[in-house]
Amino acid sequence: MAAVTMSVPGRKAPPRPGPVPEAAQPFLFTPRGPSAGGGPGSGTSPQVEWTARRLVWVPSELHGFEAAALRDEGEEEAEVELAESGRRLRLPRDQIQRMNPPKFSKAEDMAELTCLNEASVLHNLRERYYSGLIYTYSGLFCVVINPYKQLPIYTEAIVEMYRGKKRHEVPPHVYAVTEGAYRSMLQDREDQSILCTGESGAGKTENTKKVIQYLAHVASSPKGRKEPGVPGELERQLLQANPILEAFGNAKTVKNDNSSRFGKFIRINFDVAGYIVGANIETYLLEKSRAIRQAKDECSFHIFYQLLGGAGEQLKADLLLEPCSHYRFLTNGPSSSPGQERELFQETLESLRVLGFSHEEIISMLRMVSAVLQFGNIALKRERNTDQATMPDNTAAQKLCRLLGLGVTDFSRALLTPRIKVGRDYVQKAQTKEQADFALEALAKATYERLFRWLVLRLNRALDRSPRQGASFLGILDIAGFEIFQLNSFEQLCINYTNEKLQQLFNHTMFVLEQEEYQREGIPWTFLDFGLDLQPCIDLIERPANPPGLLALLDEECWFPKATDKSFVEKVAQEQGGHPKFQRPRHLRDQADFSVLHYAGKVDYKANEWLMKNMDPLNDNVAALLHQSTDRLTAEIWKDVEGIVGLEQVSSLGDGPPGGRPRRGMFRTVGQLYKESLSRLMATLSNTNPSFVRCIVPNHEKRAGKLEPRLVLDQLRCNGVLEGIRICRQGFPNRILFQEFRQRYEILTPNAIPKGFMDGKQACEKMIQALELDPNLYRVGQSKIFFRAGVLAQLEEERDLKVTDIIVSFQAAARGYLARRAFQKRQQQQSALRVMQRNCAAYLKLRHWQWWRLFTKVKPLLQVTRQDEVLQARAQELQKVQELQQQSAREVGELQGRVAQLEEERARLAEQLRAEAELCAEAEETRGRLAARKQELELVVSELEARVGEEEECSRQMQTEKKRLQQHIQELEAHLEAEEGARQKLQLEKVTTEAKMKKFEEDLLLLEDQNSKLSKERKLLEDRLAEFSSQAAEEEEKVKSLNKLRLKYEATIADMEDRLRKEEKGRQELEKLKRRLDGESSELQEQMVEQQQRAEELRAQLGRKEEELQAALARAEDEGGARAQLLKSLREAQAALAEAQEDLESERVARTKAEKQRRDLGEELEALRGELEDTLDSTNAQQELRSKREQEVTELKKTLEEETRIHEAAVQELRQRHGQALGELAEQLEQARRGKGAWEKTRLALEAEVSELRAELSSLQTARQEGEQRRRRLELQLQEVQGRAGDGERARAEAAEKLQRAQAELENVSGALNEAESKTIRLSKELSSTEAQLHDAQELLQEETRAKLALGSRVRAMEAEAAGLREQLEEEAAARERAGRELQTAQAQLSEWRRRQEEEAGALEAGEEARRRAAREAEALTQRLAEKTETVDRLERGRRRLQQELDDATMDLEQQRQLVSTLEKKQRKFDQLLAEEKAAVLRAVEERERAEAEGREREARALSLTRALEEEQEAREELERQNRALRAELEALLSSKDDVGKSVHELERACRVAEQAANDLRAQVTELEDELTAAEDAKLRLEVTVQALKTQHERDLQGRDEAGEERRRQLAKQLRDAEVERDEERKQRTLAVAARKKLEGELEELKAQMASAGQGKEEAVKQLRKMQAQMKELWREVEETRTSREEIFSQNRESEKRLKGLEAEVLRLQEELAASDRARRQAQQDRDEMADEVANGNLSKAAILEEKRQLEGRLGQLEEELEEEQSNSELLNDRYRKLLLQVESLTTELSAERSFSAKAESGRQQLERQIQELRGRLGEEDAGARARHKMTIAALESKLAQAEEQLEQETRERILSGKLVRRAEKRLKEVVLQVEEERRVADQLRDQLEKGNLRVKQLKRQLEEAEEEASRAQAGRRRLQRELEDVTESAESMNREVTTLRNRLRRGPLTFTTRTVRQVFRLEEGVASDEEAEEAQPGSGPSPEPEGSPPAHPQ
């Protein structure tokens, strides 16, 4: 695969799992090939193109990002060439993003990308999506893009493929995420959660279903798998719960056809073994308003359409259903066809039955759904004379009351004239039409919502069987996605608020908690702030106070009298108007009331009916009526009618008295309930280990195969995908405790930890050392060890391999033991056979001896007397054994009876306990409701009491408050006077400070005059220094020291980093100062303008300070630009440092030669430096004097800045205090005015209200006493219930004790069985000896036949009893033992009884029978064991074969390495021999290389001169810009001191300061000149690669022509296939028409046969629909072809548009270039001194211009080739136009066929109507007609199947041929490239062989073997040559630096760095003069060394 793990060395790509269906492979696995960086051959072309063209990503409006080749790279801009159109652009460098190498194409984990940027992530996702790969890992989480089509990657085979696999072993999939969470839950014993998040329509619900499907398959219990067909199985119920929730909670929206209109959290409980033991579903915020009202192009919930389209006639009659168009609540039509609705309805009913819903419950639910629709059909009108509502037609009301079990009269009265409470009495109030309509809609919404809540509770009761057994759980969250409509309401606010919380949880988990754990564990880590904190937006919504959020303000408005939606919006704007995430509407015409800036974008909200939605009021009269309904379900869901908000309470909000308000605590708003449920959900998720699945919407058109880049980029930015990948790569995502790490991986380091006790941390560190891990891959914390991504997976693989080796060793030892044991047994058998043979031979010798015969006859007679005694003793022993056996049988029977009794008692107690638990739960729920009710009442009472006290104190406090306000006003006036005095004092301090500043400036002027004198003296010394510097420059030119260059780069980088940190710190301080000053100054200005005019002088001072602030801001902006430039320079310097380090590694050989020369020259250089330092000693005193003066100036500046800062701080503090005082004064004055106006009105109302409240308080106290009495009664009842529960608990404990005793007895029996098993092992050894004695004992048994028969009968009886006992024991041990143990137990019992019989009675024949039976069983067992052994051996052989293949591959790899090393040795030896024999060849090569080196040196000199000229110009422009900025800053500073005055002398002094600063900046610029040379190297690459690009371009053009031709052939073939299919369709349709006509004739003749014919017709219609579906599929393919063609045309048009735009951009840039040239010429005139320094480069400028003209000529040729390509593209467009004509003709034919099909469909409908009319008269059925019709249908079906099979075969052949053609084309290209490469190598070798001698001919065979190595060595030599040339160029750059230092030494005393740079510029002047001399005398210069070493100059 393309995925390559970068963090773990040596990690391999995951192997492709075993059997995977072929149809699923393209959608799971990344295709291997050139794009994926396949093999060497396959991946050469993309890799070469990527390397040669330097491909990058540039922004594109259409594609998001577009590939381009980097042509030229400047300091701030770069020139790129678009890969598709070939157009060139100049873009800022920060808009260009790097491209990953081709081997990272379609990477499975985006954390592995080398270049991590938005373009690479988007390209990777787009490539995978277009290849059908919708799942991609993004660090620690998974990204899935909705494919908008069905994919075959969710079958059982795919589930089995992911089962038990680690993440890196299988492709990305939601199954892999689920498997990882499931395994983490089992291993870590930590609750897990899987969060599917994303926008609406992204696929969250589908992925949730797949997660549940996988868990139900993987974690199903073995008990459930015994009988899979039994309904009620837990896993099946869990799967069937989804269709029910989707039917009642999902609906079709604009973005999604199956959108979840509620949120759900499915908690699946697991036991300790990992099996599912129960589930629980929690739902959040059902969008109940959809049941009564839907937006345009949207539908209501699925269940309505399923019920109307899928119910039978009888059910429709029972539920009083009507067509869909008759219902007012269903504004839009059904979401799918009636056939689909019927199937979905049957599926929903079947799911309800599986979940255990009874038929009565299902009918009650459907009746309530029909009643919700009937609510909307009730029509109300307004009476003529009054506003009262009436119901002229009560038909809909009668249907509604029939469905809900209500009385029509009561319902109408409660709806139109409800009883409301006025004081203590109830009166009937007539409702207006608007109020009644609102009440009806509210009742409909509430009914559906309560039905949904009841349904969820019923599902939980069915799923949550045993919650106490759950050891841990795994939760799946599916919440409504983020929604942004044109106008959004309260439901969208709640949904988006939930998504904000989830995204904040993701950010907190990924970015904050991760880093906090690093810091907690003591790992060195720098905290990274990714800027993804969403808390401000969450606070805006949920904050309770200071200031309150949207929900708190909404709840507050619900309590206020006469509150409206408008007042709510105004209060929100007042409280949250300044919040950064809140925006007001900008224009009055805007429909939105306010906007919230969510993480996913700006959302406009319209606050219509938000107060009503938040309170959710109902008609409490109708609600009470519903509670008393005769329908059980209706009464149950309306049982809690006490806590609802009545309509009279809502009306009191608008009509009540001014001081009245509803009772607080009586009900809770929707916002409060939702906020609490969301808080519980967040707490649950925070206690789990979350796994995130980020779902992405590819387009809003719901089209498959289309991806909009901008849309996907926005979602990636919002989801924090890049940040998640970055912290996964930088951090340590895998961690494990020390103890677990040691326990799990100690097997890998067996001897690393010494014996004895050792601390866990020390043990882990020793293990890590033994594992030899890279220290960068892990960190050791305080309690855990942390690993980078992939390291733990590698350790797991090594552990698996180690465990495999150990198991193999154990198996080998076990098999060896078994083999030795079998061998010993075989030896024993052989010895026994020898004894028997010896005895038989002796018997054969003795049987004819007469004495022997006599002995055999007499010996039995001697034992007859003793035989009776022996038999009698054995009979007694046998009787004892039988008694013991009977006694044990009786004990076993008693035990079994007791166990059965205990089981019954346990079941009874469990049932009783379950009932008690349910009663206890109900009592607890009742108690909770009562407690809540009590608390609410207590709150109301306490609030009323507090209000009474507050109102009594209010009148007393108003007067005191008024006096206090007046006194405060007086204090404020006095404070203002004090502030005015302080202001005047500050003004005096300012004048004093300015005087000090003037004095400081005069001192500075004197110092600068002295400095000018010192400068003149320094110039005299510089002339002498220049002579020594010129000599040193000639010697330093030959040094080319790479070490000095590296040290310079490191010093430059360190200096830049220091400056960057300082600049950043300064910028942050300035930004903070700017923000603080902006806010404070604006507030002060507004308050001072509004409150008083006396602060005019202070405002003038504020204006002057603002001007100073603007100047400071300008300086800050300049510093920010300089910082950005330094950042760029830093990056370039780092890149140059990396290149220099690489060059350092490759140039070690060449460095040794240069090192020797450097030491010689270094000694001379040190001598010259000593002389130079002696000359500089005389200037040290002057430099020390100057440094002291500079230090004094610096200290004076610091003192001045400190005083200015103190002054500004004092002014700001004064402003702040003044502003605060004015604000408080204004606020208190306003409050006083409002209080004074409202006090008189309020006092009268309060007096009346106090009397009413006292009366109400007395009534409430009586109600409180009654509530107390009821509470006491309920507490007594609760104590009784608890007592009963305690009795049940004690009974349960006794039952548990009895059960434990029974288990102990069972364990005793099991011990006896185990002893029998041990005896079996011993008897198996004795069996062999018994079998040997059996033959001898058979002759003795002939005389004991009678006794044998008697004993045989006893034995059979005992065997029967033993069999019964064995069966009973097997039943008891079935739960603990498997079939093998049972077989061993039976065998052990048989062997035991047989042994006793042989010892006691000698009944050997019965023993023989038992032996044969045991032998048969043993043989069967042995056979099974052999089969298992054979299976194991087969698997072992397969494993060994794979291991052997792996070892072979490893050996082959080692052999290849050895071969490579051998070839390298041969190559070196051959090179030595060849060097001796090819002197002439080498001389020719050296001459050619010398000529090439001279040409390159001249080109390099020309380029260096060009670069020097351009760099000087750029430096001059930069200095001019900085000079202008400093002048502007100086003018700004001087303008702020107009009152002090300015002078010409001060301006001149400021100019000199600016020039000095410019000189310092110029020094910084010159230090960065070397880094700019890398950008100019593109010109050299362009000249080298033009021809290669031209060849590649022609090859690409030819490939595109071939691809277009292939595409045309494929389209033509598809058209032919479509025509063939259309003809076949026409034939089938003709046959169907003929069959229909025949049926019509038979209808006229045989009307009695129409029932069966109708059934057959329906089947034929199904076939016709299938064929129509196939035709639609073909039409869809034609449409896709057309769309693809249109997309190609649109892309061509877009390319032309972009070309024109870019041409205009080029013209604009040329104009800007001309303007910059004019500015540059002006700058050249201003800087005459620098023009003298670059005068030496004018001679080479003409040659550079000539070269530039040549390059422009070549570019013109390339443009002509581009025009040829455009003409070729026009030819391709013509071909596509022809294909379009063919497609249109086929479209017309298809439309004709479709019209014919429509006619046939109309005929079919007419025939159906006739059949419907005659169906009532049909009585009999004709079997013959049915048979004939079935034969016709079978024929049609067979033809259709043949056509489908033929179509599939042709499709497969077409796909296969396409693959073969593409494979052949790839192979052909590879062969062509290989042939060209071989031809080139052969030409080179042929030239060398022609120049060789006889020695070369003798070594020809060795040359053929090593020709590939020779070519590589030649390429390496060329590379070394180029690198040596690069070193030469770097030395020349050093020369330029020396020249710069010389120039600076002329200007004044310099630091060591400045002197070095001046010396480099002096050296450059020397180089320039040497180059002019060489151009004048080309033959006089020395020739270069053969290996590219620098030319030797004379010393």
Swiss-Prot record:
PTM sites of type Phosphothreonine: T1194
All copies of domain Myosin motor, residue ranges: 105-800
Residue positions where Phosphoserine is found in the record: S60, S1969, S1980, S1983, S1989
Gene Ontology cellular component terms for the protein in this record: actomyosin; brush border; cytoplasm; cytosol; extracellular exosome; growth cone; membrane; myosin filament
Domain IQ span(s) in chain numbering: 803-832
Family in the record: Belongs to the TRAFAC class myosin-kinesin ATPase superfamily. Myosin family.
Assembly and binders: Myosin is a hexameric protein that consists of 2 heavy chain subunits (MHC), 2 alkali light chain subunits (MLC) and 2 regulatory light chain subunits (MLC-2).
Protein name per Swiss-Prot or TrEMBL: Myosin-14
Taxonomy of the source species: Eukaryota, Metazoa, Chordata, Craniata, Vertebrata
